[in-house]
Regions:
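Globin-like tetrapyrrole-binding proteins
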Residues: 1-221
Length: 221
């Protein structure tokens, strides 16, 4: 006997198509709409997952939903961030000798935007932030990732942990530009606390690396 598929009847096929239509419609909603529509499905508790985390459950949920919009444009956001960093702190370019921007172009936005080397480096940095945000609810995992990367930077000659903090405002500005009108006051507050945690943990990791490797790595004063 030939087995009849569950989709052999016109009614079943129509039901499947209707279901797909609903999914497609939801996917077309803006990130802002998706965030608002799904918050009610999450734990509305304001309790902190871990007392060392700067965000509660709902805020971490909102951060992850919003970050999806950024992650689709990470290359753009990353270049925007580093361009702002270098425009304000051109002296840091000595740490990025692989980025081919001539001295006379240090205040030229297009020079940074057209740099393939900067785009590549920006992508690496933004992937690190992406990894941290994706596991933000797991303090130990997130802290370990960031501390390890921060510690690695103690091997870079003349690099100082405080340089991480110079990325704070440029990051927030880049996020605001990419999100546009979806960057509500609430999301601004969430991103500020998230990036402060990320950058401070990187800085702490650098300090730990310096302490552990003092005999091997010496930085100039």
């Amino acid at each position: 006997m030939t087995r009849v598929s569950n989709l052999d009847t016109p009614r079943d096929k129509k039901a499947l198509l209707d279901k797909k239509s609903i999914i497609s419609h939801d996917d077309l909603l803006s990130p802002k709409q998706n965030i608002n529509d799904n918050v009610s499905n999450q734990d509305s508790s304001t309790g902190i997952l871990d007392p060392r985390l700067p965000l509660n459950r709902r805020e971490i949920f909102l951060l992850n939903k919003s970050w999806k919009g950024i992650s689709r444009n990470m290359d753009i956001a990353g270049v925007k961030m580093f361009t702002k960093i270098f425009l304000k702190n051109p002296e840091l370019l000595v740490l990025f000798r692989h980025i081919n921007v001539q001295k006379e172009d240090h205040q030229n936005v297009e020079a940074y935007e057209n740099s393939m080397e900067l785009e590549t480096h920006s992508e690496i940095v933004m992937n690190t932030i992406d990894e941290a945000i994706s596991c933000f609810a797991d303090y130990d995992k997130c802290h370990q990732i960031l501390s390890s990367i921060g510690s690695f930077h103690c091997t870079i000659r003349n690099f100082k942990g405080e340089y991480f903090l110079k990325a704070r405002d440029p990051f927030l500005q880049a996020v605001a530009e990419v999100l546009g009108d979806r960057n509500s006051e609430n999301m601004q507050s969430i991103y500020k606390r998230a990036i402060d945690f990320i950058l401070n943990t990187l800085c702490e990791g650098w300090k730990s690396g310096i302490e552990l490797n003092k005999p091997k790595y010496l930085t100039t004063p």
